[in-house]
Structures are given as structure tokens and as C-alpha cells.
């Protein structure tokens, strides 16, 4: 057994007890007669005291930072130490030595740029800040799942090797599939629609791939997509569901990750339900009134969303009813204005984190929608054929986990919140 306790479990009530702890050497101070080691494990940092004359003293006198050790010792209450206790070592076993000097300072005293951090990623992931990020992510994903389970959704898994473009675009990674061309899925969209046509309420948390040329803080070539599809629903039902998901997610993180948020020195935004809605058309007019050169049909990009955020003064808001031709072929038109669609984006300040819509469920309408966009319905026959068999009205959304994590952590780049990000320049580690 490598340990009896995590360092966070040590407390003054254990004074005089013999314990075994294990972890990484976070810092060392040699005061001549004593060596103080800060030992780090998954739960935090604790203090180890090694007295001169002890068998362990010679073992650690030249120990390098980030070496892994097991400490047998006795707990002593000391208000000056982390958690009010320290462990006086009786024996120390060196499990592995770390080479010195380290290519990255895990303590954070010496700052590193993002390229260095990504190159030396394992050491970077040992930093308390990165461990806080990954704990927050775990709680956020758990919250997402739990909310959907409570609403009767079923978790599903869709193919990631596909025959044609899901969105009809060109941002695809081709792969050779037994002599035939195939692609990595850019979205589970078509398959989750089919699944909703069978079991009504489905969701998936899985990787997706887009051959993004954009080298921005908000784009990756490989990302985790959190997708939902719901039968007998429209985009208003979906927006109401998203409000519950985001509300629960933020509050679960605040409740379960109090220490991690302190490490990051950040507080996620408060969610006010209902979340404010502004139509695309009204957003365009508001932007024009502020001197932005934009017209109906244009995308509302990050610079424009910054202006919108400054005017709306809302951390979270929906932009609804986008032009139909600006959305994917499966998006439903508004009955009262076919130029517009039953669609939305959820924006965090100036960053899109969710996109969704009501979906077309009539085959002939879908075929026409494909043709209008210059796409061949025959390429989508595997999808369209099932609309001959009672496809219900349905709606859904896709949520980018990395972007949601920017909202939950206050960090500025998706590369910071993904353990091993993939972009145009990076295939390793």
C-alpha cells in the first residue's frame, strides 16, 4: 500500500498517529538540521519534516523537484503548516527521480508562455491551476449528464467515421476506409436526429473534428461536443432546457469546486432565468446604431459580439431567429417569415458556446433546403430515407465543452482548458 491518507485528509485530530502519504516533491527547503518538503498529491499540498540523523535525511538531501516519494511518518499538529499539521518522517522511499532542472516550473513562480506549457504539458498539468481546471470540467460534465437524465434523456454514441459531410461544409478530415474515402465526423447531427426519431430524447458527449484554419483562442481541430436532440419539441423548448443545464452546471461548479475556483481566483457568472433573448434582426439594428458596418445576412462575429455585450450588459444571452440561409440545411424556417429560421446561439459575453434550432422533419423540405445550398440530396439519402417513416418534429443543440470551460474558469484560450489540444500546428503531445 502506497498511502493510508491523502494530504488533505491530515488534520490536528490525527496528532501522534502514524500515516503513510505519497506524491510529488513540490518544494524543498534545507535549513541545515531539518529538511522541509512540500508534498503534493491529487488533493493538495502537505508539509513533511525530515530531521538530520534520520535514515530518510540522506535520501532526500539532494532530491529533485517533481520526484515521487512515499513517506512513513507521524502527524504533528502545527498551526503554521498546511491544514494545521505536518508529518515528521520516519522513513522515505524514493519511487522515481525527476531530472533537474525542470523544463517548466510546476510551482508557478517562474511563468511560462502557452507554447512552453503545451510542449511540457505533463508538468503543466501538475500545476494546481490546471488540476483545478480539470476538476471543474469533470463536475461540469457530470452536471450536464445529471440534468439530462432527470429530463428523461438517454445517452447515445454515434459513428465518428462517416461517409459524407454532416453540415455540408468543407471543414473535413478525410480518412482512408478500406480503400474508400471517408471522413472524421464534424458533428453527430444527422445520427442524433435519427435517434430522436426512435427514442425521442438523446444526448452525446464525444469528440468531433473540424479542419479549422482559424488560429484563434476559441478554435480547435479536435474538440468535445455535447449534443442534445429532442423529439416533439421546438427551439423554445430547447432554449428552456439549456437554461436549466447552464444554471445547474454553474451552481454545481460553485458548490463542488469552491477550492478550485479560489486557486483560479475566479467566480463564474450568475445565471438569471429566463436568459435574455435578442433577435438577430434586433441585434443587427443595435450594432448599426453603434456605428458597426454590418447588414442583414452577415455573421455576427466576435468583434460585433463584444459591442453587443457592452450594450446588453448580460453575461449570458440568446441571439435568436438567424437568417435561414446562414444556418445548416436541417434548420427549420419560421412560418411567419421564411427568410428567418427557428434557431439560436447562446452567447457568453462575446463567445458563442451553444448553437441550436428546430429541425426540418419533412423530407421534401429537407431536399429543397439541400438544393438551395448547392448540395446534392443523393449524398444524404442514408439520412433522408428515414423521413418517409413518421419522423416527428424535433429540435436540438450542440455545446462546445472547451468554450463552456472558459465561462467556468475565466481562462482566455481553449488551448488552456484541454489537456492535449489539437490545432493547425500541434499533433503532439
Swiss-Prot record:
InterPro entries per the UniProt record, alphabetical: Aa-tRNA-synt_II, aa-tRNA-synth_II, aa-tRNA-synth_II/BPL/LPL, Asp-tRNA_synthase_2, Asp/Asn-tRNA-synth_IIb, NA-bd_OB-fold, NA-bd_OB_tRNA
GO cellular-component term (any): cytosol
Known role: Aspartyl-tRNA synthetase with relaxed tRNA specificity since it is able to aspartylate not only its cognate tRNA(Asp) but also tRNA(Asn). Reaction proceeds in two steps: L-aspartate is first activated by ATP to form Asp-AMP and then transferred to the acceptor end of tRNA(Asp/Asn).
Keywords assigned: Aminoacyl-tRNA synthetase, ATP-binding, Cytoplasm, Ligase, Magnesium, Metal-binding, Nucleotide-binding, Protein biosynthesis
UniProt-listed Pfam families: tRNA-synt_2, tRNA_anti-codon
Location within or outside the cell: Cytoplasm
Subunit structure: Homodimer.
Protein name as catalogued: Aspartate--tRNA(Asp/Asn) ligase
Cofactor note: Binds 3 Mg(2+) cations per subunit. The strongest magnesium site (Mg1) is bound to the beta- and gamma-phosphates of ATP and four water molecules complete its coordination sphere.
Gene: aspS
Coarse class of the protein's main subcellular location: cytoplasm
Nucleotide-binding in keyword set: yes
Residue(s) at site: Important for tRNA non-discrimination: 82
Organism field: Saccharolobus solfataricus (strain ATCC 35092 / DSM 1617 / JCM 11322 / P2)
Binding site for ATP: 210-212, 352, 400-403
Amino acid at each position: 500500500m502506497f498511502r493510508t491518507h491523502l494530504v488533505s485528509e491530515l488534520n490536528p485530530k490525527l496528532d501522534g498517529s502514524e500515516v503513510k502519504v505519497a506524491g510529488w516533491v513540490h518544494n524543498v527547503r534545507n535549513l541545515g538540521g531539518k529538511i522541509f518538503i512540500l508534498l503534493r498529491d491529487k488533493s493538495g499540498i502537505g508539509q513533511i519534516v525530515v530531521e538530520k540523523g534520520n535514515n530518510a535525511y540522506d535520501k532526500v538531501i539532494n532530491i529533485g523537484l517533481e520526484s515521487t516519494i512515499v513517506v512513513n511518518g507521524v502527524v504533528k499538529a502545527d498551526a503554521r503548516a498546511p491544514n494545521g499539521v505536518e508529518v515528521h518522517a520516519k522513513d522515505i522511499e524514493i519511487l522515481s527521480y525527476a531530472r533537474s532542472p525542470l523544463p517548466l516550473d510546476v510551482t508557478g513562480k517562474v511563468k511560462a508562455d502557452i507554447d512552453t506549457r503545451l510542449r511540457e504539458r505533463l508538468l503543466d498539468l501538475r500545476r494546481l491551476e490546471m488540476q483545478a481546471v480539470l476538476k471543474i470540467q469533470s463536475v461540469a460534465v457530470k452536471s450536464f449528464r445529471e440534468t439530462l437524465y432527470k429530463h428523461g434523456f438517454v445517452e447515445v454514441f454515434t459513428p465518428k467515421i462517416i461517409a459524407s459531410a454532416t453540415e455540408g461544409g468543407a471543414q473535413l478530415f478525410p480518412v482512408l476506409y478500406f480503400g474508400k474515402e471517408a471522413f472524421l465526423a464534424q458533428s453527430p447531427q444527422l445520427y442524433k436526429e435519427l435517434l430522436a426519431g426512435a427514442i425521442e430524447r438523446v444526448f452525446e458527449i464525444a469528440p468531433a473534428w473540424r479542419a479549422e484554419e482559424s488560429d484563434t483562442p476559441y478554435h480547435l481541430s479536435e474538440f468535445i461536443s455535447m449534443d442534445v436532440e429532442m423529439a416533439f419539441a421546438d427551439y423554445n423548448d430547447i432554449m428552456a432546457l439549456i437554461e436549466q443545464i447552464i444554471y445547474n452546471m454553474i451552481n454545481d461548479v460553485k458548490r463542488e469546486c469552491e477550492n478550485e475556483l479560489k486557486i483560479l481566483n475566479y467566480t463564474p457568472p450568475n445565471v438569471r432565468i429566463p436568459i435574455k433573448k435578442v433577435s438577430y434582426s434586433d441585434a443587427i439594428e443595435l450594432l448599426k446604431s453603434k456605428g458597426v458596418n454590418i447588414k442583414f445576412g452577415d455573421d455576427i462575429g466576435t468583434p460585433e459580439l463584444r459591442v453587443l455585450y457592452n450594450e446588453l450588459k448580460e453575461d449570458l444571452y440568446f441571439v435568436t431567429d438567424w437568417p435561414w440561409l446562414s444556418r445548416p440545411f436541417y434548420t427549420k424556417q419560421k412560418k411567419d417569415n421564411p427568410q428567418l429560421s427557428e434557431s439560436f446561439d447562446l452567447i457568453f459575453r462575446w463567445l458563442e458556446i451553444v448553437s441550436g434550432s428546430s429541425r426540418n422533419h419533412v423530407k421534401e423540405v429537407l431536399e429543397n433546403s439541400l438544393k438551395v445550398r448547392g448540395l446534392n440530396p443523393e449524398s444524404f439519402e442514408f439520412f433522408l430515407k428515414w423521413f418517409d417513416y413518421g419522423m416527428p418534429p424535433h429540435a436540438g443543440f450542440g455545446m462546445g465543452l472547451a468554450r463552456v470551460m472558459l465561462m467556468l474558469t475565466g481562462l482566455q484560450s481553449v488551448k488552456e482548458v484541454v489537456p492535449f489540444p489539437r490545432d493547425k500546428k500541434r499533433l503532439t503531445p
